[in-house]
């Protein structure tokens, strides 16, 4: 197995960035990928777009998209006792939240640790034990005596709250634990792809859009697509692994990238899908298909941009999405990098334009 640059993944996973607060992540992307591209720029929603130009004039544009934001919270109220009432930003399930360590990031960039409050089970009636606490009812215990103490720390209403999770290799080091793999693992894929292509002569212009605000309505993808005006687009995102005792389904970790046929918001272009399958077979890369009936990816708003964009999604399976700790597999990460790199090396300008429906 090829070596994984764990430092990139560690920095991406441990960085804090909910929708609208993605600057920490965009700085990491720029740090690791700017040297491999011709230029980069930000759009007005904060998406970072990195561009590798073909030497051929009027080359078709291929857009890679991966979102930087993670699910988290903002502080909605500070009680007189110094507790922080939270408002979820993105989708949370109440069962995974009690007693989790979280980190508050102030507007000045200072970071403080707290714990999501939970009731002790002693004497709790059965109906309360079985209740899922709504995510907007949770509070953060900062270990302070008063609201005045909170103010002295510089914490204010509106500050970002994210899981405090340390990235690490697990007992089998092919398994990687961290927060925010949705979608930082795919941001890492795109960084590695741009670096792999740095010295390659391509028939297409490649635009990597590290997008914003996906978890709150797939908002950043559309303005990024309008900025780029791509001929085709590939969204990179995670999908749910179903290989645990709770699920026992088909998508397992470590079996290669996942090609999305459709999800609830996008029907992937069938010719683009077939080309991706062809590249995978040629490179002897395992792959699976996905039909995600709930949720969507950046492809949702990219394919509806302008007069329409040929698009599909390539995914990496992930355990425990939208929680404080997620698990991925190195093999899926590496094989997705290879698949995308080879696709971009092999795709011709004629093929790129032939994918358009009706031509």
Q: Where in this protein do the model-derived segments appear?
A:
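N-terminal hydrophobic/helix-forming segments and targeting peptides
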Residues: 1-359
